[in-house]
Amino acid sequence: MARPGFVLEVDERTPPLLVHQGEGFRLQKFPLGSRVIYPPDSLPKLRWLRNHIRDALDHPHGSEPLRELLTPGMKLTIAIDDISIPLPPMQSPDIRQLVLEEVIELAARRGVEDVKLYMANSLHRRMTADEIKHAVGERVFRSFYPKDLKNHDAEDPENLAYVGKTDQGEEVEINKRAMESDLLIYVNINLVAMDGGHKSVPVGLASYRSVKHHHNVHTMLHSKSYMDPRPGRSAIHDSCRRMGDVLMANGLKVFTIETTMNNNTFPDPFAFMNKREWEWSLVEQGTYLAAKKANDMGPSAMKHQIWTRIKSPAGVTGIVAGDTDAVHEQTLATLHRQQLVEVDGQSDIMVVGLPYICPYNVNSIMNPILVHCLGPGYLFNLYRNKPVVRPGGAMIMFHPVPNEFHQVHHPSYVDLFEEVLTETTDPSTIESKYEERYATDPWYIHLYRKSYAYHGVHPFYMWYWGAHGLDYLGDVIVVGGDPKTCDRLGYRAASSFRDVVKKVSPAVVNIEA
């Protein structure tokens, strides 16, 4: 049985602790009395995955078995989570591949011939052929790509269906083929509690016309937690749930397949990162020293290649299928067993190490706006009831925050950074003054549809994602961050951890740089 997570209180015996810092890492001493949150150990991975998949399809929650829903002559569409999850990408075979092979084989046996597959990339960049192949596997790729396996196109008016409005006036528009199908199967990987459920179809297969109703400043500021989909807790999930209700009321039949992963994130030679520091063996201590030395001395381009090529050995901990709500309830229960840690009381300062990866820079670059999304956005919001830091407290992040952008993937990010953030960092002002122009710009739309660029509006959403955190926090300081870049973001930069902690808490002593 996996050990539960716990909160370590730093004392004289506590060794330096591992901290991520972009495409780097370090061991850091923390002040006495600091509390360090450790997640539960990795849950045991499921063995014989194909058997578990078949069992989930044959014994779904709140639905007939999938075989009973598949009939000759029907129109079947399968939507698949895109490259934004899991993080890092899985080692082959990806769980999506195994699920798809079982679903498609079952459909063939039931006489279903009209089958289309879509990567549910919403306003994310299109996946390349190699990226799609890694997710779905060689067999599915060769059978369907490119005619019947495609990226969803949120700007293709010929393949979008306007469905209606929610009782809150939110417009619902999704992939036309999906809406007109006799059955839509959604294949999901649930990395965190924000994923899955009704956030899958109404977001993954939607257009900007629809997404803008929940990816906005008002929604972000009125969410108590992005990671708590209980009604009334997350405005974005409440909106997606209303949209899901509209889709079902208009005849869309969805069979949801959700999967969960354990915490076995990093492969060798970085497997020591999966363990608590005081439990490192002598070999793992030596591996840390060698890996850090090589990483620190290597050219930046080489380091980037090493990190972006990492494939995670994470194991599958759950496979659930059936009705979306019934499935997601089971999914969240498994996620919580793997991720929840009880923390007693809030702190003055929250410290996080930002890793090299987030949902929007897979095979790409972590640009400054994505640093903002990952820090005050995702990591600040990794709580269920209350933030771990008090209102008005400080957030300290470790990251170099270089002024670097992927010119193909993030063109509108560059322009937002250079044009918009030089004028204002206020999310509401940015939204009202600039969003529509970027969202409807013909060049950005062309790059989204024909190249591999994120939609022109996407960096705005990444900026809004940090709105709740910045509204709540009193200070954000980045250790090792580029001063000019941090200033553009509205942060403070510090050269060392000792300096930054003394700035926000002068009484702190006994700390190393």
What are these regions (language model features)?
Residues 364-365, 369-477:
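C-terminal catalytic subdomain
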Residues 75, 79-84, 188, 259-261, ...:
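Short loop/turn segments at strand-loop or loop-helix junctions that form parts
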Residues 142-346, 353-356, 376-381, 387-389:
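Conserved, well-structured core segments that form the ligand-binding/active-site neighborhood
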